Amino acid sequence: IGSNTIVLLVYEMVEHYPTAILHISTPAHLIDYVNVDRIMSKEGILKATEVLQSYADKLDEMQVQYRFADVTEPCRIQNQEELVQALQTTGWDIYPLSGNEEALYDFLGTKYSYPNLTNGSAFDVGGGSTELISFKNGQPIDAMSFPLGCVRLRHLPIDTPECEREILSARREYPS
């Protein structure tokens, strides 16, 4: 569950490797329901819950019993507990991810997709945050997350105190 889209992926194990058999991506624009105080509105929570319930219905049709959802940037809000409780009513196991956890998952995805790539950096520019991960000899050496993604930046008016405050806040967390 991301700031911009909610994705359903169903995997089947084929010769000990996960193989995707279903991929649905629903634009939910959850970031649009989060105010400047980092509180998601009731409408945003309802939107996320409705999408997750529609996915649960699809999995019921497929007779998939185990289901879990990682929640990225949308869960880094003041009313996280309210969002998680609402999402759990759909029958899913809900796992809120910190920015660094998200970056480490990005690393694992990169490693899986490019098994011969052992040194480098990966970037994940999402709707509400950007994750950076550096790796050497196939191992992560540094991971960070900035609360600035393409949708959030699009909503910030350029050359305003609000924009400057958001960027400086992100920079303070990760001094160069």
What are the language-model segments listed below?
Residues 98-121:
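Conserved phosphate-binding catalytic cores of ATP/NTP-utilizing and phosphoryl-transfer enzymes
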Residues 154-176:
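ATP/pyrophosphate-binding catalytic subdomain of soluble kinases
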Residues 71-75, 126-128, 176:
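Glycine-rich beta-strand-to-loop/alpha-helix junction loops that act as flexible
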Residues 53-67, 169-176:
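Phosphate/pyrophosphate-binding loops at sites that engage ATP/ADP/AMP, CoA/4′-phosphopantetheine
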Residues 1-5, 123-129:
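A short acidic Gly-Thr/Ser loop motif
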Residues 5-43, 136-162:
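Short glycine-rich, Thr/Ser-proximal phosphate-binding strand/loop in the N-terminal lobe
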Residues 92-97:
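A glycine-rich helix N-cap at a beta->alpha junction
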Residues 58-85:
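Short beta-strand-loop/turn "lid" adjacent to the catalytic site in phosphate-handling enzymes
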